[in-house]
Amino acid sequence: MDDLIIVDCQYDFIDGTLACAHSHEAVAWLIDFINTHEVRALYTSDWHSETNGSFKKNGGICPVHCVAGSEGAALDPSFPRDIKWSANRPSKENLFLKGLRDDVEEYSAFHGMNAEGKALHDVASSHVYVGGIASEYCGKETVLSLLQSGRSVTLLVPGLGWVAEEGHKKALAELKGLGALLVEA
């Protein structure tokens, strides 16, 4: 069975401090994909402390976002509510946290860890689908890491949210050029 890695579909990237374009549509599309395809869902979450170095208040460039345990860090509630097969709903086994270190900006979810201490790269299958938010940042870097590890990646374009459309298109072209397959519909 192939995996679907759902990158950072969290409140702050959907309706919060770093809300992205097409995020609501991406979540709905991903849920439909999960419900109509035989895949194993793996979720990633940005998970920061209040003292994270990427925050403007701490000398970084980003507004405060995805603080561990906050509303902003919560996955979209549609995932546990609307996914039919319970094993594909978010759980401690299939949720991988990244951005835990204050001194490192971690866009890629490749090294994200679940509650059992397993890294995403240790459990992901040889072929993965990827969707989520934001295509130019965490989505792109996660796909790059997966490709560099020798995995086959199918990027689900309708299941992506983005910061800026120009950056989104540029990221898609770059990833396609590096070997990712793009599914447009």
Feature names for model-found ranges:
Residues M1-F96, S126, R151-T154, V163-E184:
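Active-site acidic carboxylates
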Residues I31-I34, Y137-Q148:
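Histidine-anchored nucleotide/phosphate-binding helix
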Residues S45, L97-L100, G132, V157:
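Short, structured patches in soluble enzyme cores that scaffold and shape functional sites
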Residues S54-F55, E106-A109, E141, E166-G167:
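Short, well-ordered secondary-structure micro-motifs
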Residues L75, A119-L120, T142, A171:
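Residues within well-ordered alpha-helices
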Residues R89-H121:
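Histidine/lysine/aspartate-rich catalytic loop segments that bind and position anionic ligands
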Residues D103-V104, L160-E165:
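Short, small-residue-enriched loops and turns at beta-alpha junctions
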Residues H127-E141, L155-L160:
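Glycine-rich anion-binding loop/nest that anchors nucleotide
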